[in-house]
């Protein structure tokens, strides 16, 4: 008798994706982050669902409804902090996942990579709108500053901003629609992740060497299911440690103050995972230029496959490119630090230099270095 998992219409899909999937025998722990992102998404959807049962998206009651969740709902504080810090874990996994793709040349799978870039935008949009919902000072002013950037667009800018706000400022209409979008977007992300996997399974996984691994495949289960479970346990350990020991470590104290349109906080800044893009935005004195740089800081990832000049796919055997990759990582950490600093000397010039270096590395220096490495190997 044929195995049910290979014949049943539904089980067949699961089987070909997670059980009998042929996987390269040498993929390292850097390939764990896909499954970790899936777990993060499930955690966020579940905790978000329970939060939505008690949350009210009205400017008069939003802040107190979050307080009510933390004080009066059974384990409400736990659900709230799991959701808030789960977002941080989500972004840590995302950045490591993208970094892995850049290092090992996974971007050569064009469809998978481009859907990944789209997913990154969708997750960032979701996180931004989620940050507005508690209706604290940083929620309100963050929403005001970031949505106001759209007014830099020629002709349609100011109309577009008022259309998004649903009025002449960030108010009840804005909060209500942000809540609606924040609720629906994770399901769109889940669907996109399904398409991401679909395209990945068309080609099969890349591996650290960047070479074709068709001659040496092993079944996904039990080898990589066990490996993924270990990764998930470590993720849950990190998340629960953060939630139970230092839940406010990554938050902003200003968000424990009720939103007040008449009182501007001294330093308006987004959550830590947006600080690198925020630093790039601030480093350009022109409003429209800043907005373009902000969008391009993420969109530049879509151009990376077309700038691949090396004869080798992975950076595993390319020491010069490796060096530049780690300079890029250091540059992004510098930008993250600068994004959280006030706009004053010497932070302004450091931010501008780091922003220029970021784009130069990706668009110019790395492709030229790859050509140089080809010549070194007489290819």
From Swiss-Prot:
Topological category with respect to the lipid bilayer: Multi-pass membrane protein
One Gene Ontology term, aspect cellular component: mitochondrial inner membrane
Superkingdom: Eukaryota
SUPFAM superfamilies, alphabetized: a domain/subunit of cytochrome bc1 complex (Ubiquinol-cytochrome c reductase) (SSF81648), Transmembrane di-heme cytochromes (SSF81342)
Family recorded in the similarity comment: Belongs to the cytochrome b family.
Function: Component of the ubiquinol-cytochrome c reductase complex (complex III or cytochrome b-c1 complex) that is part of the mitochondrial respiratory chain. The b-c1 complex mediates electron transfer from ubiquinol to cytochrome c. Contributes to the generation of a proton gradient across the mitochondrial membrane that is then used for ATP synthesis.
The protein, known as: Cytochrome b
């Amino acid at each position: 008798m044929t195995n049910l998992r290979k014949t049943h219409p539904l089980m067949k899909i699961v089987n070909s994706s997670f059980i009998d999937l042929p996987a390269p025998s040498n993929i390292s722990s850097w390939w764990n982050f896909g499954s970790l992102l899936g777990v993060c998404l499930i955690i966020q959807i579940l905790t978000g669902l329970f939060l939505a049962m008690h949350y009210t998206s009205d400017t008069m009651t939003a802040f107190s409804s979050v307080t009510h969740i933390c004080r009066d709902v059974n384990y409400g504080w736990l659900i709230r902090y799991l959701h808030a810090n789960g977002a941080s874990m989500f972004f840590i996994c995302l950045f490591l996942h993208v970094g892995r793709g850049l290092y090992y040349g996974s971007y050569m799978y064009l469809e998978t990579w481009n859907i990944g870039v789209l997913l990154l935008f969708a997750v960032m949009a979701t996180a931004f709108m989620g940050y507005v919902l508690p209706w604290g000072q940083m929620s309100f002013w963050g929403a005001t500053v970031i949505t106001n950037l759209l007014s830099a667009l020629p002709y349609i800018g100011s109309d577009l901003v008022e259309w998004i706000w649903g009025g002449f400022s960030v108010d009840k209409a804005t909060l209500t629609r942000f809540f609606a979008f924040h609720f629906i977007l994770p399901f769109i992300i889940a669907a996109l992740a399904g398409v991401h996997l679909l395209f990945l399974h068309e080609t099969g996984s890349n591996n650290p060497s960047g070479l074709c691994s068709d001659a040496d495949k092993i079944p996904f289960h039990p080898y990589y299911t066990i490996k993924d479970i270990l990764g998930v346990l470590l993720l849950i350990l990190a998340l629960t440690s953060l939630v139970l020991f230092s839940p406010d470590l990554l938050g902003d104290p200003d968000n424990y103050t009720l939103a007040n349109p008449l009182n501007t906080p001294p330093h308006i800044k987004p959550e830590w995972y947006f600080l690198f893009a925020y630093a790039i935005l601030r480093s350009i004195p022109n409003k429209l230029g800043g907005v373009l740089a902000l969008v391009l800081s993420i969109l530049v990832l879509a151009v990376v496959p077309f700038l691949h000049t090396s004869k080798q796919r992975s950076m595993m055997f390319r020491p010069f490119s490796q060096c530049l990759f780690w300079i890029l990582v250091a540059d992004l950490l510098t930008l993250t630090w600068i994004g959280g600093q006030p706009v004053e000397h010497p932070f302004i010039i450091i931010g501008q230099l780091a922003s220029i270096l970021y784009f130069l590395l990706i668009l110019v220096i790395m492709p030229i270095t790859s050509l140089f490495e080809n010549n070194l190997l007489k290819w």
